[in-house]
């Protein structure tokens, strides 16, 4: 049975959240402004990148790179023309 870990970042006026459910098959869900916009699965502790769009005009392509393990999962937010940012873990 896996455990759920939550991460968040605000970017360009939009809320980006990620949930990583660990286990033999890790599941990553990404929400933009509260709506699920992307998901992916990976096996064991292999990293996975989820590509999503921010609803800007024109839409902005961003991605969340999730690493389920080993240890505590982590998520990195990547957007054009900026350094990658570590997403803050959330306790809920």
Where are the regions that the model predicts?
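Cysteine-centric segments in proteins
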Residues: 1-92
């Amino acid at each position: 049975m896996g455990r759920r870990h939550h991460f968040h970042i605000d970017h360009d006026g939009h809320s980006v959240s990620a949930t990583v459910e660990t286990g033999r098959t890790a599941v990553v869900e990404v929400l933009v402004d509260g709506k699920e916009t992307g998901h992916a699965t990976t096996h064991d502790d292999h990293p996975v990148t989820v590509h999503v769009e921010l609803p800007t005009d024109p839409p902005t392509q961003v991605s969340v790179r999730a690493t389920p393990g080993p240890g505590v999962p982590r998520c990195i937010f990547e957007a054009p023309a900026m350094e990658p940012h570590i997403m803050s873990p959330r306790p809920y």
